[in-house]
Amino acid sequence: MKIIDDPQEFQRIMAARNRIAASQRALSRKWISDTRVFAMAAEGIVHFVDDEYKLFADAFCAEAPGRLFGVSNEDGPPGWDHAVMVEQSTEDEFEQLETEFYGQYFLLFSEDERHAVLFTQAGYKLIAGPLSFLHRFFPDLSSQKREFLEFKNEELSYRHTVGYEQALETAVRFMNWLD
C-alpha cells in the first residue's frame, strides 16, 4: 500500500471521491449510482460483526483489482483527508488498509468496475462492488434481501429521520435491482 503524496494525484483522487460521496452523512442517489464505487463500510471495517470481517477480507483478496484507492471521508480540519493506493489484493494489504483508516468513515473504490450495492443487516453497513464481489460476500442475495426487508420493517416501526427512512427505501430498490 502506498500513501499518495503527489498533490496533483491526490487532488484527482479526492475529486473522484467527492463525486462518489456527495456527503458523509447521507446516501445520496448520486453516490449510490456512481459506477466508480468499489466498497464502503459506513463505520470502517473494524465495526464488522461475527464473520463479516473474514467474508469481506476473502472477497477483497479474491476480487479486488490490482489498483484500488482508499480515501478518508471525514469533515475534519484541513489536511485531515488522505488517500492510499492498494497495489496488491492480499490479506496484508487489507489489514494495512484497516489500520490506515481505523475507525474512520472511508471509501474504497476502483475507477473501472461496474458496481452493485448491498446493505448488511448488522449495524446498517453498505457494501458496494462488482456483483461477483457481492456473491462472495453473500452467496444468496435473495436471502439477504429477505433479512434486510425484515430489518427495514422493524426499524420503521419507530420514528427515524426522513433521510434514514429514504436510505432504507433506496437499499430495497437496489436489492430489487440485484434480484
Predicted features along the sequence, with ranges:
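Structured alpha/beta or helical-core interaction and ligand-binding surfaces enriched in interleaved
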Residues: M1-K125, G129-D179
